Amino acid sequence: MDNKNKIGFIGAGIMGQGMVQNLLEAGHEVNVIAHRNRLPIDELVALGAKEMMSLFDMASCCNIFILCLPSSQAVMSVCNVLFSRALPKTLIIDCTTNELITVKELARQAKAARLRYVEAPLTGGQQQSREAMLGAIVGCDVEDFVMVSNILKPCCAHIERLGELGMGATTKLISNFLALGTATLVVEAMKAANNLGVDWKKFYKLAS
């Protein structure tokens, strides 16, 4: 690990809190910022994270950013500040599940600002985040992938580059379709089992 790296983590909530904990345990310097809920921030500061009072302060001292936000709109709002304040060559790893059009626009803006923007939407949930068992679906330039992998390694069990920027969002969408379709199929199978007089609890154990 490069001890000169200073990570700014934006979105230390349900998914992000576990990621920050794992980054801290791996020895990274992590800076966090509060939004609505202070509890995760207070807990992370107690573990060694540094709290920043504003995005402006964070942009002036961090050379790597990880975004884990609830929507593309939130990402655009944050990046409007970061892209205007961050130093050239700053690496921005966006773990948000974004719309493809958002990724393309952020990539364009980052290039104009001489920043390195990478998309890395995640698979898994809160428990996987805490256990460092997330999956990262990365879309980026080839030369950025090694550094991105090293940064995300403490948080993720699987990190795969699917191609250039945009492929992360595309692959995550397909992954969501697959998960939703599988869940629907399971529900329908259980309903059919119940309707046909099959003990669905025993059937579930057999099928699991």
Q: Residues of each region from the PLM?
A:
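NAD(P)+-binding Rossmann beta1-loop-alpha1 motif at the extreme N-terminus of oxidoreductases
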Residues: M1-C61, T90, Q126
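Hydrophobic residues within alpha-helices
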Residues: M19-V20, L106, A192
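Hydrophobic beta-strand scaffold residues
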Residues: V30, E51, R116-V118, I159, ...
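Rossmann-fold NAD(P) dinucleotide-binding segment
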Residues: L55-R116
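Rossmann-fold dinucleotide-binding core
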Residues: N98-L180
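Helical "substrate-binding/catalytic lid" subdomain
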Residues: M167-S208
